[in-house]
Amino acid sequence: MRKVKIGELINSLVSEVEAIDASDRPQGDKTKKIKAAALKYKNALFNDKRKFRGKGLEKRISANTFNSYMSRARKRFDDRLHHNFEKNVIKLSEKYPLYSEELSSWLSMPAASIRQHMSRLQAKLKEIMPLAEDLSNIKIGTKNSEAKINKLANKYPEWQFAISDLNSEDWKDKRDYLYKLFQQGSSLLEDLNNLKVNHEVLYHLQLSSAERTSIQQRWANVLSEKKRNVVVIDYPRYMQAIYDIINKPIVSFDLTTRRGMAPLAFALAALSGRRMIEIMLQGEFSVAGKYTVTFLGQAKKRSEDKGISRKIYTLCDATLFVSLVNELRSCPAAADFDEVIKGYGENDTRSENGRINAILATAFNPWVKTFLGDDRRVYKDSRAIYARIAYEMFFRVDPRWKNVDEDVFFMEILGHDDENTQLHYKQFKLANFSRTWRPNVGEENARLAALQKLDSMMPDFARGDAGVRIHETVKQLVEQDPSIKITNSTLRPFNFSTRLIPRYLEFAADALGQFVGENGQWQLKDEAPAIVLPDEEILEPMDDVDLDDENHDDETLDDDEIEVDESEGEELEEAGDAEEAEVAEQEEKHPGKPNFKAPRDNGDGTYMVEFEFGGRHYAWSGAAGNRVEAMQSAWSAYFK
């Protein structure tokens, strides 16, 4: 089975198009060659009817993945203009002299800025017809027309100066000039709709109508499933759990690992409705009010649209939110993001955001499933839950929304350009919601209280004051971080006896709320009530589509390979796979033999031993004369 990197296909396409552009062929021949190159790329991925028929269809990527890979290819040409763009813009500026200055300025702009300015001009020209109708109802030059004209100027800010001039003494000349703007602008709008800005290849890297219909039907099916399988969140439990996270001391998080970032990263997303990449990297937040921030850096937008700021709600104090975002981004586990976004080489065609998301989703999603107690839940669910909470909390009471419906509310707070996209963010409902609910920040430290009940037993627990000292140390640790897990490694730096530590942990296990798990290590008892309320009918996990606007990014496509050919036998792609198979075979021959890791000498006469047996992991720490004796003691501790 031969596999080809999608990056190789895209780089091959780019090289071929560049060679065509650099050739001395007539432009008509270049266009034909470019179209053929785009067709070859599409056939390799999806459209080759000879390759993808019969059983070959099983190896073909989905239409949605095809669309995402097409987007990757298109992005490589984003900064290139159409070969006739300059010539056509010059013609337009000569044909429409009243708009010549605006059109001519495009010739010195990069492609992204041209698209932005063109979009603004088109939006302005689309206002000509309604503006002309409104003006026809005003008798310009009369005494009572001034107020009406000022009101109209405020209604159409892009035309404000031209409209305001109608209140001047030479209003007739200004009116005639405005009508000329209307006349030329109406024709210009039609010509702009036919103006090709992008490189020629982009017009051939498009989905067919059948492919687009297939994708749209899948989105419709996903939406239908969501609407008929809502998820109920217990609002007080969910928010209390989120507040418990953000109220912890920052030192209580293990921010040296990606998995250690998960609790704080999810909590910040839950409180703001922002995407993972917006929280971790590209979002810019500044305090705008007690529970509002100004947000810049919306993901899944063209580069020219990312400079638009939005005012969004935070479900906690905005100052605390911004502070925690900065703390999270400056932690050691996020220090290598600049390297990650560079990718693994020229054939890594994922977006920078996609590269970050690939490593973080793997680290964060397992924690989210545990936190919510539901294997169907993932990090991005925080966005939809936030939208529902924000709607219940603010929509009916904030004057900002008095003239709009709920669809506009969801669109605005989520940053969508399309009112239909927000329909996918209504899968969650809230149970026990109350606008007057407040988090319990003064809750008694139950573990500390339970430990304090053991105080009277400590003087006789060990020789001298050893029992009292280890007990006081544990109480201090639990007071600083109520959720800390106390283990051998936690107490070893305090130089307590290696025999005393496991004895104390066993004695205080109930007070600490800990137990020895299947892996032989201490675990915290999770007695928190369920956040996701049980369904009457358990749903199977749904292969969801991340639908954010019409610009679908490739963040979820972590696999950079596709199968482009078939063979009868299966081959191992790397030698490492063969080695793993050999190890597995040996393990099958000797199922009863424990697998020890090399014992770790702690330097104080004690050893740390870990081993696996019967599919379970075991750990032991204690005094021993040598490594062999340590391994024997570890085995005896569990299997006498």
From Swiss-Prot:
Keywords: DNA replication, DNA-binding, Endonuclease, Hydrolase, Nuclease, Viral DNA replication. The keyword Repressor does not apply. Residues 545-585 have a biased composition (Acidic residues). Pfam families: ResT-TelK_cat, TelK_muzzle, TelK_N, TelK_stirrup. DNA binds at R275, K300, R383, H416. GO terms for molecular function: DNA binding; endonuclease activity. The active site is at Y425 (nucleophile). Transmembrane segments: none annotated. Converts the circular intermediates produced by the viral replication and carrying a joined telomere site to a linear DNA molecule with covalently closed hairpin ends. The viral circular DNA is cleaved at a palindromic site called telRL thereby generating a linear prophage plasmid with telomeres. Binds covalently to the 3'-phosphoryl of the cleaved strands. Monomer. Homodimer; in presence of DNA. This is Protelomerase. It comes from Klebsiella oxytoca phage phiKO2.
